[in-house]
Amino acid sequence: METPMNMTEQAATKDPAREQFYRRIDQYNLTPLWEVLGTLVPNNPRPKQVPALWRYADVREHVMESGTLITAEEAVRRVLILENPALRGNSSITQSLYAGLQMIMPGEVAPAHRHTQTALRLVLDGEGAYTAVNGERTTMHRGDFIITPAWTWHDHGNLGDQPVVWLDGLDIPLVRFFDTGFHEHSDHAVQDTARPEGDALARYGSNLLPVDFQQQASEPTKIFVYPYAQTRAALTAIAAGAPADPHLGHKMRYVNPATGASPMPTMGAYAQLLPAGFQTAPYRCTDGTVYVCLEGAGSAQIGDQTFQFAPNDVFVVPSWHTLTLNADSETVLFSFSDRPVQQALGMWREEKH
């Protein structure tokens, strides 16, 4: 009994009449679907990005050197982009996400601007800097998760005596895909302060809301800082009261307390504690995910590759790649991905082994 030829065999068997037909229709900007169907509609995800890790101990010196070459004012944002090795030149760490290491020197200001891209910050190194969002400042402490929602005025400054470094995460590739990017510079490098520090957290993040406040699940949170001290205390309490999930350890998602949805409509953020000696069972999901080690050390087996990580190291797990985490000591990981978009579109999947 004859069996149908697979795509490779079909490609190797060139039909002269078909090839001539393809050349004729090419001038009309036409192409035959049957020649590319397997690529367009794969049986499983085939991400272009690859697993990768950036050791902070290796890249920190380059981040610091950038501070001697260009000012924050001239650069607008002094950032070294973490480019996926398979996506070089695209300013992308996954197909839909951007990540970079931003540094601000003592006395500098990264001037106020706004854009349609949503941004998150995870503070890694140094003290004394602040971020201002729509008229309110927050002092940046290591591990703090800070949001600048789409189209909000924001600037950064360093009032301390040491450089401060944080991880930037943005949905730049997603906005680029939709061709919806807008950007404006403010007339003032430093925006005026309209509210005292901590106002948004008190107003929207204390199990209370203004009596007439209403918000849709698709809108970003009014809270723009999630202090690491609170996150760490919650993880510690949770780990003391319940066994770790076999696949995830003690993993929590950041939420907009007014809606229970993701703080950002296009990116989800997560905090994860792994007990010392803990190894997760193999797990994979469709959202390519960027991880940052905040505490501890261990290894990440991503597909058939294994990466050792330490504090401030960044690693990326591509879509549908099996992940196993090993914690040498008690470890805290921060991560972010495009899961909210996939879930809203009904595309997200996970698989636990």
Regions found by a protein language model. Give the residues of each.
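A short, N-terminal "cap"/entry segment at the start of jelly-roll beta-barrel domains
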Residues: 2-94, 191-266, 270
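Double-stranded beta-helix
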Residues: 3-21, 159-219, 224, 328-353
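A short beta-loop-beta micro-motif enriched in histidine and acidic residues
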Residues: 87-98, 105-119, 135, 259-268, ...
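Conserved GNAT-family N-acetyltransferase fold
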Residues: 102, 272, 315
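A short beta-strand-loop-beta hairpin characteristic of the jelly-roll/cupin
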Residues: 105-142, 149-152, 157, 284-311
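Conserved metal-binding segment of the jelly-roll/cupin
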Residues: 133, 139-160, 166-171, 302, ...
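C-terminal structured domain segments across diverse proteins
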Residues: 260, 267-273, 283-286, 296, ...
